[in-house]
């Protein structure tokens, strides 16, 4: 990402915007993860890193990692102690092939705060308001046919990939806007939301 950014193509001709002129942008570097094989510790390290960012009032854009990093980030920048959301819960606009709300699983590869759990525990722990959040692009093969139930139980709205194809872009945008309203929004995007012909290197399909 940094190598591509360094090419200096900073304007978007189609949208007619230049983000580097609209905003003050800084690269804060990588989150140090000395316990890289310990998922639970890594999540807390991410939270510690983002606590400093949130305290300063800076709005972060985060790239990299698997989707479990969202848990660490939102523990810092949303919820009752957050300056960025004025103490409110965040509302998710979540693009993904999976809901990542599988709280019926005791763990995923030994981790509880995992890429399969973050959309659940963030609701349970008071950082995300599922009643105003929406998950878009859900698709793929499943282990069980009730795999969306856990997300619905939490209060999320879901637009599956089939529904997205049926509704079209404009209607989906309207649904998202109606759902989230004027609540503080956190947008998160998993590459496996894209078709495999576009992102063939994504491991979790």
Enumerate the predicted regions with their spans.
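Conserved alpha-helical scaffold segments that buttress catalytic/binding sites
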Residues: 2-205
């Amino acid at each position: 990402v940094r190598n591509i950014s360094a090419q200096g193509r900073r304007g978007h001709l189609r949208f007619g915007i230049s983000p580097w002129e609209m905003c003050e942008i800084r690269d804060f570097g990588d989150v140090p993860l000395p316990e890289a094989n310990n998922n639970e510790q890594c999540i807390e390290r991410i939270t510690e890193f983002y606590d400093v960012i949130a305290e300063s009032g800076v709005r972060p854009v985060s790239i990299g990692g698997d989707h479990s990093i969202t848990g660490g980030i939102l523990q810092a920048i949303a919820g009752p102690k957050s300056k960025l959301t004025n103490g409110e819960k965040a509302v998710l606009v979540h693009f993904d092939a999976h809901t990542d709300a599988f709280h019926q699983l005791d763990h995923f590869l030994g981790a509880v705060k995992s890429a399969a759990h973050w959309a659940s525990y963030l609701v349970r722990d008071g950082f995300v308001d599922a009643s105003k959040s929406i998950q878009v692009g859900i698709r793929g093969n499943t282990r069980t046919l009730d795999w969306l139930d856990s997300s619905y139980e939490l209060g999320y709205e879901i637009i599956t990939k089939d529904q997205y194809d049926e509704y079209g872009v404009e209607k989906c945008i309207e649904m998202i806007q109606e759902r989230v309203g004027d609540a503080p929004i956190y947008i998160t995007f998993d590459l496996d939301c894209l078709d495999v012909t576009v992102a063939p290197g994504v491991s979790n399909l």
